Protein backbone atom coordinates (compact mmCIF):
# COMPACT_ATOMS: atom_id res chain seq x y z
CA UNK A 1 0.00 0.00 0.00
CA UNK A 2 1.29 3.45 -0.89
CA UNK A 3 2.35 5.67 1.95
CA UNK A 4 0.10 8.47 3.20
CA UNK A 5 1.06 11.35 5.47
CA UNK A 6 -1.08 12.33 8.45
CA UNK A 7 -0.88 15.83 9.90
CA UNK A 8 -2.71 18.61 11.70
CA UNK A 9 -2.90 22.32 11.00
CA UNK A 10 -0.13 24.89 10.59
CA UNK A 11 1.38 26.22 13.82
CA UNK A 12 0.54 22.85 15.38
CA UNK A 13 -0.65 22.47 18.96
CA UNK A 14 -0.75 19.35 21.10
CA UNK A 15 -3.97 18.11 19.47
CA UNK A 16 -2.61 18.56 15.94
CA UNK A 17 0.60 16.65 16.68
CA UNK A 18 -0.65 14.22 19.30
CA UNK A 19 -3.69 13.11 17.33
CA UNK A 20 -1.61 12.73 14.16
CA UNK A 21 0.68 10.34 16.03
CA UNK A 22 -2.22 8.39 17.52
CA UNK A 23 -4.19 8.26 14.26
CA UNK A 24 -1.12 7.01 12.41
CA UNK A 25 -0.89 4.14 14.91
CA UNK A 26 -4.63 3.46 14.50
CA UNK A 27 -4.49 3.43 10.71
CA UNK A 28 -1.32 1.34 10.55
CA UNK A 29 -3.09 -1.27 12.68
CA UNK A 30 -5.74 -1.34 9.96
CA UNK A 31 -3.25 -2.05 7.20
CA UNK A 32 -2.50 1.47 6.01
CA UNK A 33 1.03 2.72 5.50
CA UNK A 34 1.12 6.11 7.23
CA UNK A 35 3.54 8.52 8.84
CA UNK A 36 2.63 11.29 11.24
CA UNK A 37 4.28 14.58 10.28
CA UNK A 38 3.79 18.19 11.31
CA UNK A 39 3.41 21.54 9.56
CA UNK A 40 5.60 23.27 12.13
CA UNK A 41 7.82 22.69 15.13
CA UNK A 42 6.31 21.35 18.34
CA UNK A 43 5.69 24.08 20.92
CA UNK A 44 6.86 23.89 24.54
CA UNK A 45 3.67 22.28 25.79
CA UNK A 46 3.65 19.65 23.05
CA UNK A 47 7.36 18.95 23.55
CA UNK A 48 6.66 18.35 27.24
CA UNK A 49 3.97 15.79 26.36
CA UNK A 50 6.11 14.07 23.73
CA UNK A 51 9.00 13.68 26.16
CA UNK A 52 6.69 12.48 28.94
CA UNK A 53 5.38 9.62 26.84
CA UNK A 54 8.54 8.75 24.93
CA UNK A 55 7.87 10.16 21.47
CA UNK A 56 10.18 12.00 19.11
CA UNK A 57 8.70 15.11 17.53
CA UNK A 58 7.33 14.33 14.05
CA UNK A 59 9.40 15.66 11.19
CA UNK A 60 8.28 18.98 9.79
CA UNK A 61 7.11 19.20 6.18
CA UNK A 62 6.38 22.25 4.07
CA UNK A 63 4.96 20.39 1.08
CA UNK A 64 3.57 16.88 0.58
CA UNK A 65 3.02 16.35 -3.16
CA UNK A 66 6.74 15.71 -3.58
CA UNK A 67 6.40 12.67 -1.26
CA UNK A 68 2.92 11.16 -1.52
CA UNK A 69 -0.24 11.11 -3.59
CA UNK A 70 -2.66 10.99 -0.66
CA UNK A 71 -2.95 12.44 2.83
CA UNK A 72 -5.08 12.24 5.97
CA UNK A 73 -5.98 15.33 8.00
CA UNK A 74 -6.54 15.71 11.72
CA UNK A 75 -7.72 18.72 13.73
CA UNK A 76 -8.48 20.90 10.69
CA UNK A 77 -10.11 20.99 7.29
CA UNK A 78 -9.89 24.60 6.07
CA UNK A 79 -7.33 24.95 3.25
CA UNK A 80 -5.73 28.13 4.58
CA UNK A 81 -4.79 26.21 7.74
CA UNK A 82 -3.32 23.26 5.86
CA UNK A 83 -0.25 22.40 3.83
CA UNK A 84 0.32 24.79 0.94
CA UNK A 85 0.12 22.16 -1.82
CA UNK A 86 -2.92 20.31 -0.52
CA UNK A 87 -4.72 20.83 -3.83
CA UNK A 88 -2.10 18.63 -5.51
CA UNK A 89 -2.87 15.52 -3.45
CA UNK A 90 -5.93 13.45 -2.54
CA UNK A 91 -7.44 13.80 0.93
CA UNK A 92 -8.65 10.33 1.94
CA UNK A 93 -9.52 10.81 5.62
CA UNK A 94 -10.38 13.68 7.97
CA UNK A 95 -10.83 13.51 11.75
CA UNK A 96 -11.79 16.88 13.21
CA UNK A 97 -13.81 18.85 15.76
CA UNK A 98 -14.02 22.23 14.03
CA UNK A 99 -16.43 23.92 11.67
CA UNK A 100 -16.30 22.80 8.04
CA UNK A 101 -15.37 25.67 5.75
CA UNK A 102 -14.06 25.94 2.18
CA UNK A 103 -13.61 22.18 2.07
CA UNK A 104 -14.33 20.11 -1.02
CA UNK A 105 -12.91 16.98 -2.64
CA UNK A 106 -13.26 15.37 -6.04
CA UNK A 107 -13.59 11.84 -4.65
CA UNK A 108 -15.54 10.46 -1.68
CA UNK A 109 -13.58 10.23 1.56
CA UNK A 110 -13.84 9.17 5.19
CA UNK A 111 -14.84 12.26 7.18
CA UNK A 112 -15.64 12.29 10.88
CA UNK A 113 -16.16 15.49 12.84
CA UNK A 114 -17.90 15.88 16.17
CA UNK A 115 -18.66 18.87 18.42
CA UNK A 116 -16.35 17.73 21.20
CA UNK A 117 -13.41 19.41 22.90
CA UNK A 118 -10.60 17.69 21.04
CA UNK A 119 -9.89 15.58 17.97
CA UNK A 120 -8.28 12.93 20.16
CA UNK A 121 -11.67 12.47 21.82
CA UNK A 122 -13.13 11.51 18.44
CA UNK A 123 -10.25 9.10 17.90
CA UNK A 124 -10.76 7.61 21.37
CA UNK A 125 -14.34 6.82 20.37
CA UNK A 126 -13.07 5.13 17.22
CA UNK A 127 -10.70 2.94 19.24
CA UNK A 128 -13.59 1.92 21.51
CA UNK A 129 -16.00 1.26 18.65
CA UNK A 130 -13.55 -1.23 17.18
CA UNK A 131 -12.56 -2.74 20.53
CA UNK A 132 -8.94 -1.80 19.91
CA UNK A 133 -6.47 -1.77 22.76
CA UNK A 134 -4.76 1.59 23.24
CA UNK A 135 -1.05 1.36 24.19
CA UNK A 136 -0.02 3.38 27.24
CA UNK A 137 2.10 5.86 25.29
CA UNK A 138 -0.63 6.43 22.71
CA UNK A 139 -3.14 6.93 25.52
CA UNK A 140 -0.77 9.43 27.11
CA UNK A 141 -0.37 11.58 24.02
CA UNK A 142 -4.13 11.50 23.36
CA UNK A 143 -4.76 12.47 26.99
CA UNK A 144 -2.33 15.36 26.57
CA UNK A 145 -4.20 16.57 23.49
CA UNK A 146 -7.55 16.59 25.29
CA UNK A 147 -6.14 18.32 28.37
CA UNK A 148 -4.54 20.95 26.14
CA UNK A 149 -7.60 21.65 23.99
CA UNK A 150 -10.05 21.72 26.90
CA UNK A 151 -7.74 23.54 29.34
CA UNK A 152 -7.96 20.61 31.74
CA UNK A 153 -11.70 20.21 31.11
CA UNK A 154 -12.44 23.85 31.99
CA UNK A 155 -13.15 25.11 28.47
CA UNK A 156 -16.80 25.51 27.40
CA UNK A 157 -15.97 23.16 24.53
CA UNK A 158 -15.66 20.32 27.05
CA UNK A 159 -18.30 17.59 26.77
CA UNK A 160 -19.13 14.55 28.87
CA UNK A 161 -17.42 12.47 26.19
CA UNK A 162 -14.18 14.42 26.72
CA UNK A 163 -14.41 13.83 30.46
CA UNK A 164 -14.97 10.11 29.99
CA UNK A 165 -12.06 9.92 27.56
CA UNK A 166 -9.73 11.71 29.97
CA UNK A 167 -10.63 9.38 32.84
CA UNK A 168 -10.05 6.26 30.77
CA UNK A 169 -6.92 7.44 28.96
CA UNK A 170 -5.32 8.57 32.24
CA UNK A 171 -5.80 5.08 33.69
CA UNK A 172 -4.21 3.47 30.64
CA UNK A 173 -1.33 5.96 30.65
CA UNK A 174 -0.82 5.54 34.39
CA UNK A 175 -1.01 9.21 35.37
CA UNK A 176 -3.11 11.44 37.61
CA UNK A 177 -4.69 13.62 34.94
CA UNK A 178 -5.25 16.60 37.24
CA UNK A 179 -1.64 16.67 38.44
CA UNK A 180 -0.18 15.93 35.02
CA UNK A 181 -2.59 18.31 33.32
CA UNK A 182 -1.48 21.27 35.39
CA UNK A 183 2.17 20.45 34.66
CA UNK A 184 1.38 20.23 30.95
CA UNK A 185 -0.49 23.53 30.77
CA UNK A 186 2.18 25.36 32.75
CA UNK A 187 4.83 24.02 30.36
CA UNK A 188 3.15 25.99 27.60
CA UNK A 189 2.85 29.30 29.44
CA UNK A 190 6.49 30.39 29.57
CA UNK A 191 6.46 33.24 27.07
CA UNK A 192 9.26 35.37 28.51
CA UNK A 193 11.97 33.82 26.35
CA UNK A 194 10.01 34.24 23.11
CA UNK A 195 9.85 37.31 20.89
CA UNK A 196 6.53 38.97 20.10
CA UNK A 197 6.94 37.82 16.50
CA UNK A 198 7.20 34.22 17.66
CA UNK A 199 4.27 34.54 20.04
CA UNK A 200 1.81 35.95 17.50
CA UNK A 201 2.60 33.04 15.18
CA UNK A 202 2.89 30.25 17.75
CA UNK A 203 -0.79 29.26 17.76
CA UNK A 204 -2.33 31.35 14.99
CA UNK A 205 -5.00 30.44 12.47
CA UNK A 206 -6.48 32.24 9.48
CA UNK A 207 -10.24 32.47 8.95
CA UNK A 208 -12.60 33.82 6.32
CA UNK A 209 -15.17 35.91 8.22
CA UNK A 210 -17.72 37.23 5.77
CA UNK A 211 -15.66 39.21 3.27
CA UNK A 212 -12.78 39.66 5.70
CA UNK A 213 -9.64 37.61 6.15
CA UNK A 214 -8.82 37.33 9.82
CA UNK A 215 -5.79 36.10 11.69
CA UNK A 216 -6.51 34.97 15.24
CA UNK A 217 -3.59 34.03 17.48
CA UNK A 218 -3.76 32.72 21.03
CA UNK A 219 -1.21 32.41 23.82
CA UNK A 220 -1.78 30.78 27.20
CA UNK A 221 -0.28 32.43 30.27
CA UNK A 222 -0.53 32.44 34.04
CA UNK A 223 0.33 36.16 34.33
CA UNK A 224 -1.61 38.42 31.95
CA UNK A 225 -0.18 41.74 33.26
CA UNK A 226 3.32 40.47 32.54
CA UNK A 227 2.30 39.62 28.97
CA UNK A 228 0.69 43.04 28.50
CA UNK A 229 3.95 44.76 29.38
CA UNK A 230 4.78 44.07 25.72
CA UNK A 231 1.45 45.35 24.41
CA UNK A 232 2.92 48.02 22.12
CA UNK A 233 5.39 45.52 20.69
CA UNK A 234 2.61 42.99 20.14
CA UNK A 235 0.44 45.52 18.29
CA UNK A 236 3.34 46.65 16.11
CA UNK A 237 4.18 43.05 15.19
CA UNK A 238 0.52 42.30 14.46
CA UNK A 239 0.22 45.38 12.24
CA UNK A 240 3.33 44.39 10.32
CA UNK A 241 2.19 40.80 9.87
CA UNK A 242 -1.29 41.87 8.77
CA UNK A 243 0.10 44.16 6.08
CA UNK A 244 2.61 41.57 4.88
CA UNK A 245 0.01 38.81 4.55
CA UNK A 246 -3.12 40.73 3.58
CA UNK A 247 -5.10 40.16 6.77
CA UNK A 248 -7.99 42.57 7.26
CA UNK A 249 -7.83 42.10 10.99
CA UNK A 250 -5.51 40.48 13.50
CA UNK A 251 -6.50 39.40 17.00
CA UNK A 252 -4.19 38.18 19.74
CA UNK A 253 -6.05 36.36 22.51
CA UNK A 254 -4.04 36.21 25.74
CA UNK A 255 -5.67 33.54 27.89
CA UNK A 256 -5.10 33.01 31.60
CA UNK A 257 -5.27 29.23 32.01
CA UNK A 258 -5.81 29.53 35.77
CA UNK A 259 -8.84 31.85 35.88
CA UNK A 260 -10.21 31.17 32.36
CA UNK A 261 -10.36 34.79 31.20
CA UNK A 262 -8.80 36.41 28.14
CA UNK A 263 -7.43 39.78 27.14
CA UNK A 264 -7.67 40.61 23.44
CA UNK A 265 -5.39 42.86 21.39
CA UNK A 266 -6.92 43.90 18.07
CA UNK A 267 -5.66 45.35 14.80
CA UNK A 268 -8.15 46.29 12.08
CA UNK A 269 -10.11 49.07 10.38
CA UNK A 270 -13.01 50.94 11.98
CA UNK A 271 -15.56 48.58 10.43
CA UNK A 272 -13.82 45.54 11.90
CA UNK A 273 -13.59 47.20 15.31
CA UNK A 274 -17.29 47.98 15.17
CA UNK A 275 -18.09 44.37 14.28
CA UNK A 276 -15.90 43.18 17.17
CA UNK A 277 -17.92 45.36 19.56
CA UNK A 278 -21.15 43.95 18.14
CA UNK A 279 -19.90 40.37 18.44
CA UNK A 280 -18.76 40.58 22.04
CA UNK A 281 -20.69 43.51 23.47
CA UNK A 282 -17.36 45.12 24.31
CA UNK A 283 -15.83 48.27 22.90
CA UNK A 284 -12.12 48.17 22.19
CA UNK A 285 -10.21 50.66 24.32
CA UNK A 286 -6.74 51.44 23.02
CA UNK A 287 -6.92 48.31 20.82
CA UNK A 288 -7.69 46.11 23.84
CA UNK A 289 -10.68 44.38 25.41
CA UNK A 290 -11.23 42.08 28.38
CA UNK A 291 -13.34 38.99 27.70
CA UNK A 292 -14.22 37.24 30.98
CA UNK A 293 -14.83 33.52 30.69
CA UNK A 294 -13.63 33.39 27.10
CA UNK A 295 -10.97 30.76 26.46
CA UNK A 296 -11.97 28.97 23.25
CA UNK A 297 -11.14 30.40 19.84
CA UNK A 298 -13.22 27.67 18.20
CA UNK A 299 -16.41 28.06 20.23
CA UNK A 300 -16.34 31.52 21.81
CA UNK A 301 -14.47 33.72 19.34
CA UNK A 302 -14.85 32.53 15.74
CA UNK A 303 -18.64 31.85 15.82
CA UNK A 304 -19.74 35.27 17.19
CA UNK A 305 -17.32 37.05 14.86
CA UNK A 306 -18.59 35.04 11.89
CA UNK A 307 -22.22 35.85 12.71
CA UNK A 308 -21.42 39.54 13.21
CA UNK A 309 -19.48 39.88 9.96
CA UNK A 310 -22.16 38.06 7.97
CA UNK A 311 -25.07 40.01 9.48
Swiss-Prot record:
Record localization: Cytoplasm
PANTHER family documented for this protein: BIFUNCTIONAL OLIGORIBONUCLEASE AND PAP PHOSPHATASE NRNA
Cofactors required: Mn(2+)
Co-factor remark: Binds 2 manganese ions per subunit.
Enzyme type, top EC level: hydrolase
Binding residues for Mn(2+) 2: 15, 75, 97, 149
One GO term describing the cellular component: cytoplasm
Organism for this UniProt entry: Lactobacillus delbrueckii subsp. bulgaricus (strain ATCC 11842 / DSM 20081 / BCRC 10696 / JCM 1002 / NBRC 13953 / NCIMB 11778 / NCTC 12712 / WDCM 00102 / Lb 14)
Name of this chain's protein: Probable manganese-dependent inorganic pyrophosphatase
Swiss-Prot/TrEMBL catalytic activity: diphosphate + H2O = 2 phosphate + H(+)
Record EC number: 3.6.1.1
Matches recorded under Pfam families: DHH (PF01368), DHHA2 (PF02833)
Amino acid sequence: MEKELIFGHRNPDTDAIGTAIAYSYFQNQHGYNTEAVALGEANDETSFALKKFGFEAPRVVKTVANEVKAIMLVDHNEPQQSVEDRDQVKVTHVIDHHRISNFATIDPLFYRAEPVGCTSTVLWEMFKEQNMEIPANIAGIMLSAIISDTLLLKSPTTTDIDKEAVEELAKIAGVDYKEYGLELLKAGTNIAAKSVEELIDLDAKSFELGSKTARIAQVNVVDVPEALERKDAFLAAMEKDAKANGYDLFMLVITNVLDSDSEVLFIGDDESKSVFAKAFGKELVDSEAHLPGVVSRKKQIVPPLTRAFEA
